[in-house]
Design a protein with these regions (language model features):
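N-terminal [4Fe-4S]-dependent radical SAM core
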Residues: 1-19, 29, 224-299
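Glycine-rich beta-alpha loop elements in corrinoid/cobalamin-binding modules
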Residues: 29, 37, 56-249, 256
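Terminal amphipathic helices with adjacent charged low-complexity linkers/tails
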Residues: 61, 189-237, 251, 260-263, ...
Length: 642
């Protein structure tokens, strides 16, 4: 019989429990799978002997919905879920999404805006004397004063506004156990300065070696102060050399302790070897379950962390740059568990993490001294000390595909092709194409302008073209017809109209036709978001061009889909503005024909439209493929949560 964590009073009674130690409020539907953070935290606490219950997506208008499992003995836990609740609800154009893959039946509207704040207020109303701990991606990335794109304002730390006692940042397993032990031993408050990976409020600056960044009051009115604060926070996010950070809010301080140490391989194995049912809670059966599970139910998380340091990605600020991997045996055991499930069809959908082929530390130094301050490991140029060996990842994939009951093992999470090139490993590409590509391999060049890719922290155009050549050569040798599917992004800070035109010309020359494109979304806590808000690169203090006006962003977006008749006026306006009339005409180099703006809009109305964008939330392009690119639900938001 599958056993879920407690969700109802009847579950408590069946176990003979009069009360719970922790009640966890989640903005996501309850899915008991290791890709869903509430399940991981709940199971981890359970494994240490604590009694845990989950209230998933409670009615935030009714305080009684938060009381249904009774008063917790130790603490209330609150998370918005696997995504920031505002990103979950709104597109880059600030339009409401029609679906929510983390809710039953994919229905939108089951969580409030700024869910961490709303849930926290309700739990304080329900149990005022019970300690409140917040965590998850929303809390983690809003732990300092931050820019909020959806309100276009600088907001206070979510710790201040939620009135929580503690904020856990990062992945949370080690922190929650330390906090649980401190609560259980009645030494909660005195323990706070000594627990890594948490934030708390203090009336005074702690009497330890710490660094103070500009206050909330300063960053709210001064963009240079905002950039300085971000730089300090960015530089101290290493568990080996990072110092505690304080930021004044009014007459109190937000204190961030040093980051939690990376999990050992044994700890990683333990976290993923817990007795997850790998299913959504049966209470969702009548609505067809929870769509987000379909993407990950038969996938394996082999590691955490990413040393790619993409500027727009939250991983550095949440999981860190130091890779934490699982043992082959742990992954094989999980694969065997999946094989035994009735609905397993023989396909392991993915083996990876934030980046599929980052299976080990970037270099040996990281294990002792941490990731280098002020330097990146992989891009725009790989560090001379970067360990690019792919042997461990290849060995893992070989073991998995030999398991009885496995027909195919796919690699679908982000593959860093520049890392493959640094390894000069054509054999890896050929083996990947032979056994682990399902017709299309997704990669993320994001842009081709050197100026833009440098701002993004990505490899350049040349690396993408080299990998594309390797990929095509491998498939020719194998006699396979497989396609490279690149992600591209518009309107990233630093991207001018000229850069957008350069990308359009590249797409023309490479015969790529983007069916869906992604506008940059300034999510809290990222380097790119700091650049977007301030117009400053906080790492060097230099000004950065930012396309903020809707018309300017629309022109960059339209250039990526210049063949769409609906985009004609925007593309022509952009080309004239950039003095690129040479691209208007009938020649092979031209992007559009020279008809007047506003005419010809009825042309091709009878033709079936395919691959239209949906509010800027996704990005796919075809490379010479005549077929429609397939996209599963939930995939469009994965890269913001990895």
């Amino acid at each position: 019989m599958d056993t879920f964590l407690v969700t109802e009073r009847a579950d408590m009674e069946a176990r003979g429990w009069a009360e719970l130690d922790f009640v966890l409020i989640s903005g996501d539907a309850y899915v008991d799978h290791p890709s869903f953070a509430p399940a991981v935290i709940g199971r981890y606490l359970e494994s240490k002997g604590y009694r845990v219950g989950i209230i998933a997506q409670p009615d935030w208008n009714d305080v009684n919905a938060f009381k249904k499992l009774g008063k917790p003995r130790l603490a209330s836990l609150v998370t918005a879920g696997n995504l920031d609740s505002m990103l979950n609800k709104f597109t880059a154009a600030k339009k409401i999404r029609r679906e929510d893959d983390y809710s039953p039946g994919g229905e939108a509207g089951h969580r409030p805006d700024r869910a961490t704040l709303v849930y926290s207020n309700r739990m304080k109303e329900a149990f005022r004397d019970v300690p409140l701990i917040i965590g998850g991606i929303e809390a983690s990335l809003r732990r300092f004063g931050h820019y909020d794109y959806w309100s276009d304002t600088v907001r206070r730390s979510i710790l201040v506004d939620s009135k929580a006692d503690v904020l856990i940042y990062g992945m949370g397993e080690l922190q929650i156990i330390e906090l649980a032990e401190a609560l259980d031993q009645n030494r909660f408050e005195e323990s706070l300065p000594n627990i890594r990976g948490i934030c708390y409020m203090s009336k005074d600056i702690p009497s330890i070696d710490c660094v103070e960044c500009p206050s909330f009051e300063e960053i709210k009115v001064d963009k240079m102060a905002f950039a300085d604060a971000f730089r300090i926070q960015y530089d101290e996010q290493d568990p080996f050399y990072g110092r505690p950070i304080v930021q004044k809010h009014g007459d109190r301080y937000v204190v961030q302790n040093v980051p939690a140490l990376p999990l050992t391989q044994e700890q990683m194995d333990a976290a993923y070897d817990l007795p997850y049912t790998r299913k959504w809670h049966p209470s969702y059966d009548d609505k067809g379950g929870v769509p987000a599970l379909s993407e990950v139910q038969f996938s394996l998380v082999s590691q955490r962390g990413c040393f790619g340091s993409c500027s727009f990605c939250a991983i550095t600020n949440h999981q860190g740059r130091i890779i934490q991997n699982r043992s082959h045996q742990s992954l094989i055991d999980e694969a065997k568990l999946m094989i035994s499930m009735d609905d397993f069809k023989g396909y392991i959908h993915d083996v990876g993490g934030p980046t599929a082929n980052f299976r080990h530390l970037a270099c040996d130094k990281q294990a002792v001294f941490g990731a280098c301050k002020g330097r990146t490991c992989a891009a725009p140029e790989p560090c001379e000390n970067l360990n690019t060996n792919h042997d461990d990842y290849i060995a893992l994939l070989r073991k998995l595909r030999k398991l009885k009951g496995v027909k195919k093992v796919f690699v679908r999470s982000g593959l860093r092709y520049d890392y493959v090139l640094a390894d000069n490993n054509k054999a890896f590409v050929k083996e990947l194409c032979q056994y682990h590509v399902s017709g299309q391999l997704k990669v993320a060049p994001e842009h081709v302008s050197k100026r833009v890719t440098t701002m993004m922290g990505k490899a350049g155009k040349e690396e993408f073209l080299t990998f594309k050549k390797w990929f095509e050569e491998a498939n020719r040798e194998l006699g396979k017809k497989q396609f490279l599917v690149p992600y591209f992004m518009s309107s990233h800070p630093g991207c001018t109209l000229e850069d957008a035109i350069e990308l359009a010309e590249f797409l023309r020359d490479q015969h790529m036709y983007p069916e869906q494109v992604q506008d940059f979304i300034p999510t809290p806590g990222s380097l790119s978001t700091c650049m977007y808000y301030t117009g400053i690169n906080p790492l060097d203090g230099k000004p950065v061009y930012v396309a903020k006006k809707g018309r300017d962003k629309a022109k960059q977006r339209a250039l990526m889909q210049y063949k769409n008749i609906e985009n004609y006026d925007l593309v022509k306006e952009a080309l004239i503005e950039a003095n690129r009339r040479d691209l208007i005409g009938f020649g092979p180099e031209c992007l559009i024909p020279p008809r007047p703006i506003g005419q010809g809009k009825v042309q091709n109305q009878g033709r079936k439209k395919t691959g239209q964008s949906r509010g800027g939330q996704s990005r796919y392009a075809r490379s010479g493929s005549p077929s429609q690119v397939n996209k599963t639900k939930g995939e469009r938001k994965r890269r913001f949560t990895r």
